[in-house]
From Swiss-Prot:
Extent of the signal sequence: none
Swiss-Prot/TrEMBL keywords: Cell cycle, Cytoplasm, Meiosis, Phosphoprotein, Sporulation
Protein name (database record): Target of rapamycin complex 1 subunit toc1
Known role: Component of TORC1, which regulates multiple cellular processes to control cell growth in response to environmental signals. Tor2 is essential for growth. Nutrient limitation and environmental stress signals cause inactivation of TORC1. Active TORC1 positively controls cell growth and ribosome biogenesis by regulating ribosomal protein gene expression. TORC1 negatively controls G1 cell-cycle arrest, sexual development and amino acid uptake.
Keyword Membrane listed: no
Residue numbers carrying Phosphoserine: 204, 399
Cell location: Cytoplasm
Gene Ontology process terms (BP): meiotic cell cycle; sporulation resulting in formation of a cellular spore; TORC1 signaling
Length: 430
């Protein structure tokens, strides 16, 4: 049943302690459904319930009036809000119920909304009951207010927390960006420093090698000058065939002596080989030396002839004319033995001695060596070549980073393989 009356109309007891709002006078002697919130009880301690058949009568001890009955059995509990369990309560209105509007218009009402004169005349309530009733009402309002405050505070705290977290995130992103910039700056500076050190390490050996090459060039130039001023060499002591390196410039050596190699063309881009020089090199490549037995035999024969006839001693070794001697001497001065990275000049060997410039061996003084000395000199020369070859191979092996047994035994400046590779080998890879 819908309530057509406006809010404020209803029924009440005589002291206004129990009220049912929104109920007009025409609803008496009827069972109607009333929302639980419209049943108001001011002083809960003045409430009295009388149980009947299938219903419970609600009365007020202040005015001793029973104005309504509730369907079902109800119990007085400590909390007034638990008096009615259902949202819509089915009630029956008695004739003793007074219209609420008439009571408010006829009698004075206290600040509590009840008629205190009737309550004092009929039944004086105890102070503790009144205090408990009011405390329940106040506590309800306080609880509602506190919940509202907590909700508002919680929302405020949530917003402030979000703002704080957003600020922290911005600070962290700024710190991370600055840290990355510092790291990139340090990395660039380190790369620049490493590149500078690497360039200086490459440049310093180059400068030292240039200085060494300049010193070698000066030494070779002085040696070539000495060779031009010295007496011509006309005798070769060893008898095996050797390849002789030819070079117009002293101090240059080639792996293929009888040809103009690629290295020679790179070192001498302006040099153009003439047909005469090529012919001379071809003629020089066919130069051979006689064996020990032939030299010995010629030497003995000449000695015998000298004893018999007393003529000048002449060896059977073919000696060219004066013009050919000068040409051959100039070429011999330019010839050098190439062995790895350690060059050896022919004139540095003890095989060549200062002889007289005569074109023939006219006396014993011009040929001081015995036949056995030729063999000794040849053996010494071969040993020198072997040592030079071993020396060049050891230098090449050290440059590649290997550690030789001689370095372990004799070298004081021993460096392990890893250190040698880091010092020399890795530069060649780059």
């Amino acid at each position: 049943m819908q309530l057509q009356s406006p809010f404020g109309d209803g029924i009440s007891c005589e002291c206004l302690n129990i009220r049912v709002l929104g109920i007009p006078n025409e609803t008496k002697h009827q069972w109607i459904f009333v929302p639980r919130d419209l049943i108001k009880i001011k002083i809960y301690s003045l409430l009295q319930i009388c149980k009947a058949e299938n219903c419970s009568a609600v009365a007020c001890r202040g005015c001793n009036l029973c104005i309504l009955a509730v369907q079902g059995n109800i119990e007085i509990s400590e909390e007034p809000q638990k008096l009615f369990q259902e949202e819509n309560v089915k009630v029956y209105i008695y004739d003793s119920a007074i219209s609420l509007s008439s009571v408010r218009a006829s009698f004075p009402i206290s600040e509590l909304g009840i008629r205190m004169d009737i309550i004092k005349a009929r039944a004086e309530p105890r102070e503790d009951e009144i205090r408990a009733s009011f405390s329940s009402l106040v506590n309800k309002e306080i609880k509602r207010t506190v919940e509202e405050l907590l909700l508002s505070k919680r929302s405020t705290n949530r917003l402030s927390l979000l703002a704080f977290m957003r600020n922290q995130q911005l600070n962290y992103e700024a710190y991370e960006t600055k840290l990355l910039e510092d790291a990139s700056t340090i990395e660039k500076s380190l790369e620049k420093e490493v590149k500078t050190i690497y360039d200086s390490n490459i440049a310093s050996p180059k400068e030292s090698s240039d200085a060494i090459d300049a010193d070698h060039a000066m030494i070779d130039e002085s040696r070539s000058t000495q060779r031009r001023k010295s007496k011509p060499k006309k005798h070769v002591a060893f008898t095996d065939e050797y390849q002789v390196a030819f070079s117009d410039k002293p101090g240059k050596y080639f792996n293929q002596p009888m040809q103009y190699s690629k290295q020679f063309k790179l070192d001498n881009p302006d040099y153009e080989a003439s047909s005469d020089s090529l012919n001379d090199i071809e003629n020089l490549s066919t130069l051979t030396f006689r064996s020990d037995e032939e030299l010995e035999f010629d030497f003995d024969t000449n000695n015998i002839n000298n004893n018999k006839s007393g003529d000048s001693l002449e060896m059977s070794t073919t000696i060219p004319s004066d013009e050919e001697n000068e040409d051959f001497t100039s070429k011999v001065d330019a010839m050098e033995i190439h062995s790895g990275s350690l060059p050896l000049n022919i004139d540095s060997s003890p095989i060549f001695t200062n002889h007289s410039p005569s074109s023939s061996l006219s006396s014993e003084s011009s040929f001081e060596a015995s036949p056995s000395s030729f063999v000794d000199r040849k053996n010494r020369w071969i040993q020198m070549l072997k040592k030079a070859d071993e020396h060049s191979r050891s230098i090449q092996a050290r440059s590649m980073g290997y550690v030789l047994s001689d370095d372990l035994d004799n070298s004081k400046a021993f460096r392990p393989y890893k250190q040698s590779f880091l010092a020399q080998g890795w530069k060649s890879l780059n």
